[in-house]
Amino acid sequence: MLAAHEASTSIVVPFSNFHTVAEAITTGNPMGGDEIIHKAKKYNWLAESVTEEEILVSQRKLGEVGYFVEPASATSLYAIKKLFKAEKIKEGSTVVMMLTGTGLKDLDVFKYYHLNVMESNIEKVEDDVWNLLKNIYN
């Protein structure tokens, strides 16, 4: 997806032999990929690359505020950080961060670090996410 975004194409740029801790997003030619790229262009969605270390940092930071997500879901946090720093996302903008995959889907990540389990207050979800984005990467 990122390669298509960077190349300004309207179709997926297939790849193979790619390994990442974020296994859920390693398919080299995802089903529906061309449609996603079409929507991304139509609605001016942004895309950003993240390193393996950045994925793990994001997963850990999300876990610290009560969101145990798989590495693939955690990629969005650091990507948003980079887009803010590059001023591609302006202060006060509405940003949607998809956290769809539970950390229980990919327990291999524990070989990189240990996470502590904590309770999260559902009424504070929006505040937690905004505080995370505003304060965690100062």
State each model region's role.
Residues 55-83, 93-94:
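Substrate-binding/catalytic subdomain of NAD(P)-dependent oxidoreductase enzymes
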Residues 77-138:
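Catalytic phosphate/nucleotide-handling subdomain of diverse soluble enzymes
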